């Protein structure tokens, strides 16, 4: 979106956000599929993400009680940004970020396949307008 083109610290924050979300998926999978110990998960988070041990501990304890939540969150983010990229590519100058967000966020919490259809319908409505 070009949001951080002139903001190196903002870009760094965004990249940190992506790293954190990716590491959450690794830790969630490590705990629930690879049977990592609590300590292994905390150590991974500290080493890979640079988080303080106390923060990493709280995050790991949360993932222990909600299997798959971290991965589903990241999947939702990936699908959402994919829908937005598709809309921008198909609509070009007719793409309006505010209208896009209104359309896809108005459906609330919804399965990702439904969200994809909402995005596709919104794109189609803008192409014919």
Roles of regions detected by a PLM:
Residues 1-129:
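N-terminal maturation segment of proteins
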């Amino acid at each position: 979106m070009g949001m951080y083109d002139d903001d190196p610290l903002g870009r760094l924050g965004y990249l940190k956000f992506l790293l954190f979300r990716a590491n959450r998926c690794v830790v969630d999978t490590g705990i629930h599929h690879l049977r990592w110990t609590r300590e292994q998960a905390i150590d991974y988070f500290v080493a890979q993400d640079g988080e303080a041990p106390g923060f990493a501990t709280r995050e790991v304890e949360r993932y222990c009680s909600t299997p798959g939540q971290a991965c589903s969150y990241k999947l939702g983010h990936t699908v959402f940004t994919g829908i937005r990229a598709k809309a921008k590519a198909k609509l070009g100058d007719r793409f309006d970020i505010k209208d896009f967000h209104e359309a896809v966020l108005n459906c609330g919490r919804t399965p990702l396949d439904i969200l994809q259809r909402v995005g596709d319908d919104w794109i189609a409505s803008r192409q014919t307008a």
